[in-house]
Amino acid sequence: MSAIKDESNNDHLVQSHDPEHPANLIPALCRNFYGHGWVTGTGGGASIKRDNHIFIAPSGVQKELIQPHNIFVLQYPTPKYPPSARQYIRKPLELKPSACTPLFLAAFDRGAGCCIHTHSQWAVLVTLLVEREKGLEGCFEISNIEQIKGIPKGKGKGMMGFFDTLKIPIIENTAFEEDLTSSLEEAMEKYPDTYAVLVRRHGIYVWGDDVAKAKTQCESLDYLFQLAVEMHKLGLPWVKP
């Protein structure tokens, strides 16, 4: 398929009175995330897949101020690379496409319905603690905490239990967001049941089968990361012996 030329003319794709429409949900999610400190200073982002369309928040804008008309829309499936090959069917001319786009696409290729990227301080801190305690190859692990029940065991495997050990892989940061894609996909292959990947000194990518699941899983993980930092201060182990 050739690239769509008049990307700015499909405004109907982001115009809806339905609060559950992706073009309305993404601004609402970003306002919510800003309140948590997850998308400060234009960082982070969110994307939703509906049928054969991908809706994505723009790059380099104040996330708490995003409006439906700021949303990019991609035809799906679409190539990750090169960026010029991506099939935009709506592209606000005054804004930049999200640098997270190929990483979001990696999650959608795994069957996700929504992918969230945050710059949570708690996520960053646990990546540093894991590096200090386990080295660069270590992953985040925690067990025997009630909130673990908010995380799936894997596709079609139900939710984790209180006595299960949650494992979240960590990848190294890169100078440019898009360059994280191959490492993210490698982590997805190594941990096929994961619904999240931490990025050291950067943040986290979380995805779910739909918007509600991605959001609640992101909330549960951030709770666990904050708890882990506080447990570390008290000398408490993350995984109960």
Swiss-Prot record:
Listed Pfam families: Aldolase_II
Disulfide bond positions: none
Cofactor note: Binds 1 zinc ion per subunit.
Gene Ontology process terms (BP): L-methionine salvage from methylthioadenosine
A GO CC term assigned to this protein in UniProt: cytoplasm
Keywords: Amino-acid biosynthesis, Cytoplasm, Lyase, Metal-binding, Methionine biosynthesis, Zinc
Pathway: Amino-acid biosynthesis; L-methionine biosynthesis via salvage pathway; L-methionine from S-methyl-5-thio-alpha-D-ribose 1-phosphate: step 2/6
Superkingdom to which the source organism belongs: Eukaryota
Localization in the cell: Cytoplasm
Gene3D superfamilies hit by this protein: Class II aldolase/adducin N-terminal domain
Record-level Gene Ontology MF annotations: methylthioribulose 1-phosphate dehydratase activity; zinc ion binding
Listed cofactors: Zn(2+)
InterPro entries, alphabetized: Aldolase_II/adducin_N, Aldolase_II/adducin_N_sf, MethylthioRu-1-P_deHdtase_MtnB, Salvage_MtnB_euk
Family the UniProt entry places it in: Belongs to the aldolase class II family. MtnB subfamily.
Record's function text: Catalyzes the dehydration of methylthioribulose-1-phosphate (MTRu-1-P) into 2,3-diketo-5-methylthiopentyl-1-phosphate (DK-MTP-1-P).
Record protein name field: Methylthioribulose-1-phosphate dehydratase
Annotated organism of origin: Ajellomyces dermatitidis (strain ER-3 / ATCC MYA-2586) (Blastomyces dermatitidis)
Name of the coding gene: MDE1
